[in-house]
Amino acid sequence: MTDVQPQLSAEPSARRSGAFPQQQPISAYGLIGDMRTAALVGLDGSIDWCCLPRFDSGSVFASLLDPERGGSWSVRPEGKWTSTQRYLPRTNILETTFRTPDDGIVSVTDFMPVSEDGLPSGPHPEIHRRLRCSRGRVMMNMVFMPRFEYGARTTRVESLRAGLFASDRTDQVLTLSSAKPFEWVIEQSTATARFELEKGEERWLVLRYDDDDIHPVGRYESVRKLDNTAAFWQKWSSKVRYKGPFRGMVKRSALALKLLTHSDTGALIAAPTTSLPETIGGVRNWDYRFVWLRDAAFTLAALDAVGHYREADQFMRFLKKVCRHEGGGHLQIMYGIDGRRDLIERQLDHLSGYRGSRPVRVGNGAVGQLQLDVYGEVMETADIWRRNHEMTEGTWRVLQGLVEWVSRNWHLPDSSIWEVRGEVRHYVFSKVMSWVALDRGIRMAEELSLEGDTAAWRIARDTLHAEIMDRGWSEARQSFVQSYDDEVLDAATLAIPMFRFLPWNHPRVHSTVRAVARELTTVDGELVYRYRQPDGLEGEEGAFSICTFWLAQALAMIGDREKAERIFRRMLRHANHVGLYSEEIDPASGEFLGNFPQAFTHIALINCAAALARLEGRS
């Protein structure tokens, strides 16, 4: 598998057919970012999603969620064209190449600059776009349509000598600078320009946020910033430690996860988007631009598995910060990028949603749920982290508080890893991860001679283990089930041996893996659903990509390497043209569903690839 993934092409006449002619498939995008925020760039040269100045800020481009009101910034040839898109090797710098019927070729290179040490290149987020014609003469069309605060605020766009100035009449400002002046036509706060590029010609465009001054484009040093940005990403990706046959996809997944980190706070977000639907036209549309402690912990474990440890150190600082504010060992399941607790969910009724999928939500109502598994994932990550870092008294005090909380509260019902918005229950995976929290706390306390009531923790751990084996197992299904005393299968039970609750060679592990493979997969056995029963929400959902990778890993670990690798390779073919995945896949069409790109999916890809490599004697 090479670093550059197979590419797709886009024909505008075909893309513009159907019920939603202005919205591309979710899979038709690449992601750029500077580890403060990110932007989705389509195969058609349009930036259709970008929030500034942070991942969880209001959007300035959101045509992904409403092509009329959301805003976008497109650059592409006039008339018919085809396009391909790729990342420059070992980077998060995106290149979209357009070909016209008369043999013209123009490439658009998009990036958000970072310094050579991975920090933002300055106080103001920037997007740099290089237009380069390598063949023929091509008439280009640019449309600049910013819309602040999810399109809810009035935007004013003005043409100045050095470029465009956009504001929302309050405190938000965008500037767009260009190497040569364009003849802008501005109507209804949308600026358009036609211009011609000929072979050998190159133009730079620079978008800058929150700077009242607009400068000639040369002042932004795009060439130097491109070199520095490429140098950082190439150096970072060169440290990915994986020698198996899927190196290209493992590197791409690691690079995608790195884009979802916040360099200032150490936070790791679940995805950079909100409200991309789990079913087209459905209501399961959620905001993922926050720090789920579970997802962050899984991300750090995956990055650790491929040799990147610094991210764990940064996240531990974030974790200590939120724990100091919480007190008593209690954790929310998610926090804002800066550690804020208040993530009130609201609906943006003025937006039509992706392909008519409403409501569009910002904030997340699941923030108040109890999800016991979070404690286990955090403690598992801490156990991994401490192998390469010194355990300070302050850090242990935080972790000790978490273990104490679990020892007192593991018996409570919760909402599960799947954030069920219905009745709380005794979910088996939640109980297993509570066991993990206790087990890792005991291990760290004993191995490092740290303070803690390990005797009480051990009693709680062993009691919980026995209870799970009794009430979490179904003799009728010959499988671990979703919650105590029911018969519902749940793909989350595939992860039980991954956290060493039971060894991989245990008969109940083998039987559970076989049951999931038999009953929770699509007809062809290629994709995996989370579960099959109603969960209290309207509508349906697609197959969950993390669950498919979990099944592949589990099959490999119980000895069915052939089937495991077949499922894994099929999942690799489901990646989009630049190697990215969303949360879910529509089994009928193969189209992406859910927020994109999704950390969970890339985490599971890395872990599965690493497991396959270990079984082959590689690392």
Q: Which ranges hold each PLM region?
A:
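Acidic, mature catalytic/reactive cores of soluble proteins
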Residues: 1-619
